[in-house]
Structure formats: structure tokens, C-alpha cells
Amino acid sequence: MKKRALVSVSDKTGVVEFVKGLLEQGIEVISTGGTKKLLEENGLQVIGISEVTGFPEIMDGRVKTLHPNIHGGLLAVRDNETHVAQMNELGMEPIDFVIVNLYPFKETIAKPDVTFADAIENIDIGGPTMIRSAAKNHKFVSVIVDPVDYDVVLAELKVNGEVKEETKRKLAAKVFRHTAAYDALISNYLTEQMGEESPETLTVTFEKKQDLRYGENPHQTATFYKAPFAVTSSVAYAEQLHGKELSYNNINDADAALSIVKEFTEPAVVAVKHMNPCGVGVGTDIHEAYTRAYEADPVSIFGGIIAANREIDKATAEKLHEIFLEIIIAPSFSKEALEVLQSKKNLRLLTVNIEKATSASKKLTSVQGGLLVQEEDTLSLDESTISIPTKREPSEQEWKDLKLAWKVVKHVKSNAIVLAKDDMTIGVGAGQMNRVGSAKIAITQAGEKAQGSALASDAFFPMPDTLEEAAKAGITAIIQPGGSIRDEDSIKVADTYGIAMVFTGVRHFKH
């Protein structure tokens, strides 16, 4: 019996050449609407879907393939005598190949001016039904949803006269991934339209960006997936201009660096190691900002990741060139800067649109057996809600240092303490099990620079021991959430030493 293929695609990439190949193999081709028109315009002989169904395409194409003559031909088990007898009795013929991809729902809702009606009209019904039917019966039906698979199928047909069973199974698995992702986009769109924050089920879809050499450690496998819609200010959608491919750890660190540098509107540079900032500097230009970020911790910056929120110029590039770095991320690089930095063949240079999100996106964290979902912590300091419980208020310079430290501390692993002075961090205490331990690390790192500096804490002081350490180091201003039952003890210590202290009322834990 002559084999038949059904072709109906929205993405017409390579379809003319593929159908030509099918016809050359003696396969009869059925097609619909715009696909049929394109094939005929290219001189290919195809059969209209209405000739198979005996029913016209109706309702603006909404109903054309939803017919027993199509789905019977797709779902019939060819070695089941009952199925074959029923097909013969009803005048049905088997369909052996399905080449279908779906209405461009993703592309439609990505348009800034999309209407709800446009989105709904681009929900495909017949396409998913056909490819699911074909994939279920993949022992007998080859189903292709991705133009990248056209050559594989044609090659096997030319060599073997048929598609290998293993290939059919792989194609079927791809179909169900394809429809699952498609339905996830639709369900998420409708859920967002209804303003539902915590639906009873959560379906997410990501697209493979690249395989990674390994994960956090060489014995772990890893892959990088990106969100289906371009998050322009992200590592996933950054453009790599130079250097080795990104590693798992590179991606994590680059993401952390980007998150911090987005906090600043003035020229800023952030240096990150193991997802914690080791140096942050701001200045009148990017060269000055980098100089301060470097001076914040000239030891830890070695082998680090740098993020800048302004173009890298030649002078800054020459300073960056002096030390070993893994990655430099910036909105752009001047031509002269690229010439300087590209002399280091392994240095990764990324460009990305650096802008702070206007609304909090969802952050997904996997735990054993489950998934935690929360809003990203994008909350900025609201000066209208702060309080100053101490006798002394911060000076203008102290305020400047406090704000810088507060922007940084929320990106440091808890318990987190950050010291800042003169437009740069001078000490970072991260990830300790008690707050005073983190304070001691930050103070030790700052050394003599701690004198006259500002301290930020991501959470309140459960007791005044951190304040005692700060006072001994000569720290003159502190910003913290407040809210401890022992706040009064901390306030008394601050007043004793003449420290100005600000309560924000907002905690910034980071785990």
C-alpha cells in the first residue's frame, strides 16, 4: 500500500525541500491551507485535506483535521485485525507520516500590542491533536514537529525505505515535550491574565540553551536552559563576544554579579566570587568605579567575575587586563577595549542590557521532592518608611555609605554584613551561622578602613554583640531592619558610642 504523509506547518522552514524528498520516495502527501498553497506554488503535487475528509475546512480553519478519516488513519494499529477491518469497512486509509508544527502562540503573546483575542486565536487545537495521535501510535507513524529532523528522516528513508523504530520513538518523545511546552505557555498566559498568584498546579517550560562541560564539580552533569521569553537583562540572553564557553559556576556567578550591578544607576562595578560580592565600587565614570571595586578586595577579585553598568573603555580595559578574570559583563565594550581584552583568549566577554526589573519575577528553587516559588527580592530602600531610633542621625556621607552597603547586603549569603566607605565596599562577611561572626569577618577584612565606615546587616541584631564589635572597629553608622525584642539594648549601645542607626523595617535574607 502506498504510504501517505500529512503536512500542515506554521513554520515553513525547509518544508518544500522535505516534501519534495517524500514525493521522490513515492509517498503521497496530504496538506492544508497555507502549507498546501506553498507546496503547489513550488510545483509539488499534493492532496487537499478536504479530499480525505469529504468535509470542507470551516470556521476560519478552526475545523479541518478534526475528523475520523484523519485520526482513524493515525491511530489504527496496523497489525490489529479489528482495526484494519474497521478501516476497510469505513473506507479509511492509514497515514504514515505527520509533519506538523503549531500555531505561533509564543510569538503572538510576545508582541507588545497583543490582544487577548489574538492570543486565543493562536491556540492550536487540531495540530496538537494530530501530533499526539501520531506520537501515541509511533510504532507505525513517524511524526516530525521540528524542521531540524527533516534530514534525519529523509536519510533513513533513502537508505532503509522506512524510518527506524528508535528514531520514531525519539520523535514521539519530542512531540510530547513539544505539546507539554506549548500547553505550559498557554496555561501560564491565561493564569497571569487572571492574576492567579499560586495556582493549584505549576507548569513551567524552558528551552535548552547549551550543554555544559560539567556542573558545580567535574563529577556532576549539567545543562543550561533559558526562559521562553527573552529576559534581556540576563545571562541566559547575554551575547558572548569572546572567550571559552561558560561553565555552570560561571553562569551562577555572572547572574549574581548582574543582580547586584542592576541596583545602581550611577557608574558601578561589581566583583563576584562564589556568588558573593568581594568588591563593589561606584564613581563618576566606570574607570573610577572599577578602581574602587578592585581596591575593595584586591586579593579575592583574582579569578572573579566583573559586572559593569557602563561601556568598558580602553583605560578600564587596560586595568582589567592586568589581573586574571573569568568573565567581564557590560552593556558594551569600545572597539579599543575589545582589542585590549581579546588578547586574553580564555577571558569571557559578555554584553547584556543592564536594567533593573520594574516588577518582581518568580524565583524557583528546587528542594528534594519539591519546588519553592517566591518573588525575586527586588525591593529598594524606601526612605519614607525608615526610622532613626538613635540620638544621632547619619551625616550626608554616612547616608551615602549606608545606601551603598544596603544595596549590596541583600545579595550576600545570610548571615550577611557589609561595610562601605567612600563609594566602595571595604568588608563583606557572608554565610556565617551567627551574625557577629559575619561582622568580625567584614571588620577584619576592612582593617583600618573600618574607622568611620557604615555597616549594613541583612537582618536585625538578636543581641547587641554585633554593635559592640562595630564600635570597637570605629564604625559610625549602621543600617538594619530592626524588629528584635532586644532592639532597645542595641539602641543603648549605639547611643553610648555615638553611632547613628537606621531601621528599615525590611529584612533581606538570602539562602
From Swiss-Prot:
A Pfam family assignment: AICARFT_IMPCHas
Record-listed E.C. numbers: 2.1.2.3, 3.5.4.10
Pathway stated in the Swiss-Prot or TrEMBL entry: Purine metabolism; IMP biosynthesis via de novo pathway; 5-formamido-1-(5-phospho-D-ribosyl)imidazole-4-carboxamide from 5-amino-1-(5-phospho-D-ribosyl)imidazole-4-carboxamide (10-formyl THF route): step 1/1; Purine metabolism; IMP biosynthesis via de novo pathway; IMP from 5-formamido-1-(5-phospho-D-ribosyl)imidazole-4-carboxamide: step 1/1
Example GO BP: 'de novo' IMP biosynthetic process
Xref: PROSITE patterns: MGS
Signal sequence region: none
Presence of the UniProt keyword Transferase in the record: yes
Record field: catalytic activity: (6R)-10-formyltetrahydrofolate + 5-amino-1-(5-phospho-beta-D-ribosyl)imidazole-4-carboxamide = 5-formamido-1-(5-phospho-D-ribosyl)imidazole-4-carboxamide + (6S)-5,6,7,8-tetrahydrofolate; IMP + H2O = 5-formamido-1-(5-phospho-D-ribosyl)imidazole-4-carboxamide
Residue ranges of coiled coil: none
Entries under SMART domains matching the protein: AICARFT_IMPCHas, MGS
Any GO molecular function: phosphoribosylaminoimidazolecarboxamide formyltransferase activity
GO CC terms: cytosol
Keyword vocabulary terms for this entry: Hydrolase, Multifunctional enzyme, Purine biosynthesis, Transferase
Domain MGS-like: 1-145
InterPro entries documented for this protein: AICAR_Tfase_dup_dom_sf, Cytidine_deaminase-like, MGS-like_dom, MGS-like_dom_sf, PurH-like
HAMAP family with a match to the protein in the record: PurH
Description of its domains: The IMP cyclohydrolase activity resides in the N-terminal region.
Family from the record: Belongs to the PurH family.
Descriptive protein name: Bifunctional purine biosynthesis protein PurH
